[in-house]
Amino acid sequence: MAQQYKFVFTAEQAASEGVTDHKKLPKLIRKARNLVKAPSKVGAVGRASSGRFYLGVNVEFKGLLPHFSIHAEQFLIANLALNSEPKLTHLAVSDNGTVFQDPCYDCTRFLKEINNAHQIEILIKNAHGRDGSFKSLESHMPDEFGSESILSAEPSLLLMERDNCLALIDEDSAAGGISSNADLCSFLKLEALKAANKSYAPYRKCPSGVALFCEGEVYAGWYIETVDRTISLGPVQAALVDFIARGEGKGFDKITGAVLVEKKDAKVGQEDTARKLLEKIAAPNCDFKVFHCQEERKDWITGAVLVEKKDAKEGQEGKLLEKIAAPNCDFKVSHCDEELKDWIKL
């Protein structure tokens, strides 16, 4: 059963399928499309810098508007993030297994957020082409659509390791549990918080994470946004990517518990969207809870001492504490020297 629902291939496993390099990506597209349960079957195959290969599929939710759906490329990006892959090098997308086209506008926005976007190569192949050719993502979308000019000089972009330094708000810590199971609720809450701390939300500063519970397993995902405020992947959708990739074909109606962690006054709240989606697809008795978080405060630091050499070439006395510590933090600097050893005699 696990092999039937395989979304990640090591280099050795891919080679056994005939995929020995990025030029052979089409050989995995059939497997990706076979995993699609939606009427329109779009598959995506990507090669990561680790040498592993990842699959993505489009996911549609019956009875919900298209903006709830997950594009194959978005699924692939979330799959990379869930597996801590730092870079995507090559990508192939097809809705029929023969023609390979550029990603759609929305998905290109997501791809441009990846830290090595300028290095990503896209397979282009028409119905009559034998092998097709790869072209850079940069040639598909001009520089003005990138995120480099929006973020700081040293941006932390999508797929790079993140820690949003979020902590649960005390008043939420004692909130009611899922199905009267306080231990399960606490565990899901912590898993959702972990996900929120990995959330990619550099523009609107509204990180969030979701943890889903199904038959003893927990699946998690986090909010991913783009510079375009109308294009993002919700935390429930990201958690569903984890569920689909690791759930070995389980139906969404088996999900019996869910926890969302987000900032209390987030500019982009996820609760309404998450609730609507889960009410439509999860088990009728699925218990959905929301907990709030905030950035951890550092202003409890009221005193600090630095010890360093007096004439150190690279002194450590800086202004970091002024930014994070209490306004009245007492900061002292003491100097040291190497101890003389020439008094030691045999």
Swiss-Prot record:
SUPFAM superfamilies: Cytidine deaminase-like. Pfam families: dCMP_cyt_deam_2. One of its GO terms (cellular component) is cytoplasm. Substrate binds at N58, V59, E60. The gene is CDA5. Residues 20-148, 183-304 form the CMP/dCMP-type deaminase domain. It comes from the Eukaryota. Homodimer. Zn(2+) binds at H71, C104, C107. One of its GO terms (biological process) is cytidine deamination. Keywords: Hydrolase, Metal-binding, Zinc. CDD domains: cytidine_deaminase. Its EC number is 3.5.4.5. The keyword Hydrolase applies. Its cofactor is Zn(2+). Transmembrane segments: none annotated. Gene3D superfamilies: Cytidine Deaminase, domain 2 (3.40.140.10). This enzyme scavenges exogenous and endogenous cytidine and 2'-deoxycytidine for UMP synthesis. Belongs to the cytidine and deoxycytidylate deaminase family. Binds 1 zinc ion per subunit. InterPro entries: APOBEC/CMP_deaminase_Zn-bd, CMP_dCMP_dom, Cyd/dCyd_deaminase_Zn-bd, Cyt/Deoxycyt_deaminase, Cyt_deam_dimer, Cytidine_deaminase-like. The active site is at E73. It catalyses: cytidine + H2O + H(+) = uridine + NH4(+); 2'-deoxycytidine + H2O + H(+) = 2'-deoxyuridine + NH4(+). One of its GO terms (molecular function) is zinc ion binding. This is Cytidine deaminase 5.
